[in-house]
Every structure is written in C-alpha cells, then in structure tokens.
A protein has these predicted regions:
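Active-site histidine-anchored catalytic micro-motif
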Residues: 3-242
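A conserved acidic, glycine/proline-rich C-terminal tail/linker
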Residues: 244-246
C-alpha cells in the first residue's frame, strides 16, 4: 500500500540526536543493544530517555532490549511536548508513517482511530509532532527490536492529571485484548549539579517503581519545591510516565 505523502512525518533530528545515515545508525543502535542485557519477563511498558544517543543511547538500549523478539500486536509510543505551545490535550498522528533513516515506521491506523473514538481529548495535531524529538528518537531502537511493526505515536501535550487519566482509560479499553507494549519517553532531572540530580532521580524512580501515580506526583512536587539550584524539571516526560502508571 502506498502511503500519502501528506501524512508522512519527516525526521526532525536525524544527524543531531542520532546518526542520520542508515548504515551508521544501524551500527550504532546494534552496538548499544549488544551491550544491553535482557533481565526479566516480557514487558508491557518501558520508560526510555530521549536525549541524544551519545548521552543516553546505552540507557535506551537497556530498555528496548527487554522487548527484543517479543511478538507484540500493538505498540504505542508516548512522547512529551517540547516544541508546540499551542498543542492541546493528547496529540496523535493517526495514519501514514514516520519516515526514518532506516525506513518508514508505519502507523497502526486502526488502533489510532479507536483511540480517537475512545476520548475526544485525543486528536490529530500535525504541528505538535513535526519538530518534536521525544518520539522520533525511540524509533531506531524500536525498528531493531520489533522490525516491521506498526505503532501509534501520541504526544501528551498537556500533562494534567485529567488528560493522563483520560489517555490511560482509552489505552486500557483499546488494548485490553491485545499483546501490547507502551513506551513512555522521558528523561529525568534537568539541570542540577550531579549530587542533586542523583538524589532527585532516585526519588522519582522509587516512586515509579511503587506504581503509585500519586507518589510520583508528590515526589516531583517535593523536589521542585525544595529550592534545588538549577532544577528545571524532575521528569520532562511526566505525562507519558504518569499515563503508563495509571
């Protein structure tokens, strides 16, 4: 099937956050994955960073290694909004594909439509995706551990509790009968000194491990209100992570 050019999302950060040439990118991702270890049961959700690969590629590889070879029939990648101040609710890309150096990653349009029908907050917002990197940087790893698979990209544009709960309900209802993987794209603290970053990140991760969204919210509020110098955020993908926990 030929995909309409108008709904192909072009890469925004190829050659910046990750290698822009197919062979170089494939080699880089495979090298990161070769250094990762599969350490538990097949996951239903992952948290993966979205910084440049030179900074966080080894962490992303450890996350995606857990999904290598698992036969998922639905994949959703949740990103955060760095680039579009006008984006609202949850911004989905409902059909077509994301063009990438190693080839297009097709959209699961049937699942995307079901999610849009499940909640009116989930809408197609082209501008929210065009320059955003938080989903794009996950895709080379996804292409290597789940080759040929379709996916649904959603940016949690306004990460309010209400929006996260609505998206979580929509995901739960549409994925209930499927073997699904949800990838939450998030970095951790920006930009405190090392000692403070370790403390803040440990607190955030402990809350994530508890699987208690309220604990995560409280941890972030406590850290942000603690007067830590140069702490701009505890978790820039709070919306994707919160949604996944819910």
């Amino acid at each position: 099937m030929t995909t309409k050019a108008s709904i192909i999302r072009r890469p925004a950060v190829a050659g910046q956050f990750y290698p822009g040439y197919p062979d170089e990118l494939r080699s880089s991702v495979d090298e990161y994955l070769a250094g990762a270890v599969k350490s538990g049961p097949d996951p239903v959700a992952l948290i993966s960073p979205h910084a440049g690969y030179v900074f966080s590629g080894h962490v992303a590889a450890q996350a995606f290694k857990q999904a290598e070879g698992v036969d998922y029939d639905a994949i959703v990648v949740l990103g955060t909004n760095h680039t579009d101040p006008m984006a609202r609710g949850c911004a989905i890309w409902p059909e077509g594909a994301f063009a990438m150096p190693m080839g297009d990653v097709p959209i699961d349009s049937q699942l995307a439509r079901a999610l849009m029908e499940a909640d009116s907050r989930i809408t197609f917002q082209r501008s929210a995706h065009q320059a955003e990197h938080s989903i794009e940087v996950q895709l080379p790893f996804l292409q290597r551990v789940q080759p040929g698979k379709k996916f649904v990209p959603i940016i949690v544009a306004e990460p309010t509790r209400e929006n996260c709960e609505a998206l979580a309900r929509a995901l739960a209802s549409t994925l209930r009968e499927r073997r699904a993987l949800v990838v939450a794209s998030s970095d951790l603290s920006h930009y405190p000194r090392y000692e403070d970053a370790v403390r803040v990140d440990h607190a955030s991760l402990a809350a994530v491990v508890s699987l208690d969204p309220l604990a995560l919210q409280a941890s972030i509020e406590d850290s942000m209100g603690g007067g830590i110098h140069d702490l701009h955020t505890c978790m820039c993908g709070e919306g994707p992570v919160m949604t996944t926990m819910l």
